[in-house]
Each structure stands twice: as C-alpha cells, then as structure tokens.
C-alpha cells in the first residue's frame, strides 16, 4: 500500500532465478555416473557459508562411510606452499587447523576458484551437494544443484525455504 501511494503506476514483475547458461544444457546428474560418497560444497570463503560445520560433521559421516570425500570450492587452504600459507588469514587458518585437528586431510579437498564449467562438473560428480550457510537470500548454487538434479542438503535459512521442499526436492 505504501509503495502504491508513492507511485500508483508501480507494477511488480516476478522473475524466476536466472542461472548460468551451462546449467540449462545437458547432461544432468546421474547416480551411475557420480563419484560415490562425494560431497560438494560450493563456497568456503566466509564463516557465514558454514564450511566449518561440514568439517565438524564429517567425522560422524566417516564412521559409516569411511571413503567419503568433501570437495570445497574456494581457497586451497591446505596448500603447503609458503606463499599460500603466508596469505591465509582468519577463517582460512581456522579451516586449515580444523582439518588437521580432525585428521581429515585425506577426506577434504579445497579446489580453489572454479569456472562455470568446473562448477557444473563438481555438481555432476558429487553424490550430494551440501549448502551449510547461516545466511542466504536466494542462493544460485542451490538452484544450480536443483536444475541438474543433484541430491542436496541445505541449512534452513533465508530464502531456502522458498526453493526447497524438505524430503521432496532436498533436505533441510
């Protein structure tokens, strides 16, 4: 009502998520072609994105599935190159320490920055996509996983409840 008072000719136009082009093209996720017990997390850059939560949960998963691997998009925090170690700060150092503390070096890969095609391939290769964020609006990565048919688990935050139906199109 208030906006209409300011501009009575205002019209609201709904527009679905617009994703990167390659996500609309074949192929789509296939259980027979994915890498068994592989988890993909598309963002590990800040605490709000929750990579640490996945690391903390991984030892529990490893009890049942000891060959589980988690691939994180984002800085290669496990790099042993001196130039990389010197530039790690705050959260990246925390992730590095957490991986070592929980003895997850063989089960965790930080892939660095990925191109659109590399991201798509990670979604296709993963057995499951996990979005552990504490805050989101309308996450494109969740939509990208959905359009490819990748099974997904998401935290319940922000706009995720509008994009995901628990038990049907993914899990909270």
Feature locations, PLM:
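Short hydrophobic beta-strand element within catalytic cores of glycosyltransferases
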Residues: 151-154
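Short alpha-helical donor nucleotide-sugar binding micro-motif in glycosyltransferases
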Residues: 113, 121-126
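A short, active-site helix/loop in glycosyltransferases that binds the activated sugar's phosphate group
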Residues: 1-14, 19-25, 90
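Nucleotide-activated donor-binding/catalytic signature segment of Leloir-type glycosyltransferases, i.e.
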Residues: 84-113
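Short glycine/serine-rich donor-binding loops of glycosyltransferases
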Residues: 139-142, 160
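Aromatic "clamp/platform" in nucleotide-sugar-dependent glycosyltransferases that forms part
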Residues: 134
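Conserved donor-binding/catalytic core segment of Leloir-type glycosyltransferases
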Residues: 30-49, 55-60, 70-73
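Short acidic/histidine- and often glycine-rich active-site loop of Leloir-type glycosyltransferases
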Residues: 157-167, 171-172
């Amino acid at each position: 009502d208030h906006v209409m008072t300011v501009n009575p000719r205002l019209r609201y136009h709904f527009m679905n998520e617009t994703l990167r082009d390659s996500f609309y093209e074949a192929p789509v996720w296939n259980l027979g072609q994915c890498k068994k017990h592989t988890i993909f997390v598309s963002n590990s850059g800040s605490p709000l994105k929750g990579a640490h939560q996945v690391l903390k949960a991984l030892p529990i998963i490893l009890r049942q599935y000891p060959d589980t691997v988690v691939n994180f998009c984002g800085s290669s925090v496990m790099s042993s190159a001196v130039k990389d170690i010197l530039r790690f700060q705050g959260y990246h150092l925390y992730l590095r320490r957490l991986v070592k503390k929980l003895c997850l070096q063989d089960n965790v890969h930080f892939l660095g920055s990925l191109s659109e095609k590399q991201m798509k391939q990670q979604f296709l290769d993963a057995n499951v996509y996990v979005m552990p964020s504490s805050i989101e609006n309308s996450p494109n990565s969740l939509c990208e996983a959905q359009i490819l048919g990748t099974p997904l688990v998401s935290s319940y935050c922000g706009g995720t409840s509008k994009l995901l139906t628990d038990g049907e199109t993914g899990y909270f």
